[in-house]
């Protein structure tokens, strides 16, 4: 649940004590559980997978990548038969409360099967498991847990500048002058319209 929807008291407590995970209550539990693990201890959780990718969880990812070592079964949607639809997408992960230099985690991608049994069978087959160096995620802006990328992509992120450092982004898919370029259908004079042209040349000839 979004912490902002849980009332002023909870929202205030979370903002004060869990700055890095305040985007959602489940991510607060991720951070809180980390505080309860002894150094070198292990902990397993099943949570929504949004913390792996979204910007609002970037600080939490950064903390986890620098303090924990992680292995994962990325479950995706329909991991539990009791929960239908694509809305709830989950991941199961085990983390060790210690940072290991050059640690390679195992990540099983189980997002494609649409049933609980299908995901279990795919996991046991071992055909969709990746071994990824956790430190490589740091090379990607925003630090998403993109475990399926090959080494060449991580090298490109390390060597090449990002687009944001090279160009200025502005509004996309906009005419910048709607009064000049856009017309509502009722504004067009039917006598000047052509509905039989099959290409641009035909439309031009009909003028």
Feature names for model-found ranges:
Residues 193-207:
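C-terminal target-recognition/interaction regions appended to catalytic cores
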């Amino acid at each position: 649940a979004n912490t902002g929807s849980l009332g002023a008291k909870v929202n205030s407590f979370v903002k004060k004590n869990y700055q890095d995970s305040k985007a959602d209550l489940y991510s607060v539990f991720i951070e809180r559980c980390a505080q309860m693990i002894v150094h070198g201890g292990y902990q397993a959780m099943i949570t929504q997978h949004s913390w792996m990718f979204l910007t609002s969880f970037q600080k939490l990812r950064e903390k986890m990548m620098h303090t924990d070592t992680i292995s994962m079964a990325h479950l995706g949607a329909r991991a539990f038969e009791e929960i239908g639809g694509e809305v709830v997408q989950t991941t199961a992960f085990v983390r060790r409360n210690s940072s290991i230099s050059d640690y390679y985690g195992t990540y099983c991608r189980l997002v494609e099967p649409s049933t609980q049994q299908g995901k279990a069978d795919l996991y046991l087959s071992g055909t969709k498991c990746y071994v990824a160096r956790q430190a490589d995620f740091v090379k990607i802006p925003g630090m998403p847990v993109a475990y399926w990328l090959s080494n060449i992509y991580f090298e490109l992120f390390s060597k090449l500048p990002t687009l944001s450092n090279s160009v200025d982004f502005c509004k996309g898919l906009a005419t910048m002058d709607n009064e000049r370029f856009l017309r509502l259908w009722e504004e067009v004079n039917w006598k000047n319209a052509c509905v039989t042209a099959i290409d641009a040349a035909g439309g031009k000839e009909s003028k």
